[in-house]
Amino acid sequence: MAPNPLRAVLKTFLALLLTVCTALVVVSAGTPAQAAGSKYPTLGIPPAGANDWACETTRRRPHPAVIVHGTFGDQKSLLDPLSLSLKRDGFCVFSLDYGNRATGPIQDSARELKRFVNRVLGATDAGKVQIVGHSQGGMMPRYYIKNLGGAGKVEDLVGLAPSNHGTESTGSFSTKSFCPACAQQAAGSDFLTALNNPDETPGTVDYTQVVTKYDEVVTPYTSGFLTPGPRSTNITLQDYCPVNLAEHVTIPMDRLAIAWTLNAFRRHGPANADAPLGCI
């Protein structure tokens, strides 16, 4: 019997929801010190097609692809379709778990990303990587690019519903004790103010931001945009497919979002906003 994609999506969503709920229970049941010391386990399983450390790049696909998960996520959840699509297109694909399910300080997570990118480059003998990240995973690499030497090691950064300017949906509870990264992703936070000034798109990296009007986590959804220009393109899925129903959780599995990722990775420069991509 063929697998039911809707069932798979719901199963993954419920798993993530359980993770978030568990974190909230920790906050409500424990002291701030206890919450701050909590560890959120992962299985350490990469998405399908990823982390083949013997993979060799090609002239057609010279840059390894690195997938970066979002807050409360892990390298496996939600990311199989994206990883498989990149692998089938000829990329060497890699992914990592980081930051205690991406709840720790974003600066520390960026340092983990730096070490991982260096490992990927060493294993593949490539000069640069191409990064695609979901939610915080689309924003956090910008800290690596701006402050940790990543500008010379990243060819492309594609953000899928990235939290580039934070979110107004931070909730009424305090998140600093159990999720410093959540507090840092609040709209107007000191972290984001420093990250976005004076230049949102530093270096020679090509930036592509793919967002959905139905994002219920990064709000407003336009918070994911960066300043447009020759090296920066903003894509709203519903502008190309009005009936596209992707939202924050499902966007990394969405076929149109994946198509835009491939569009960006296959060409020099960011994604081509005039590409004839529509409902898939």
Language-model features, listed with the residues they occupy:
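Conserved beta-strand scaffold positions in the cores of enzyme catalytic domains, especially
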Residues: 65, 93-95, 157, 207-209, ...
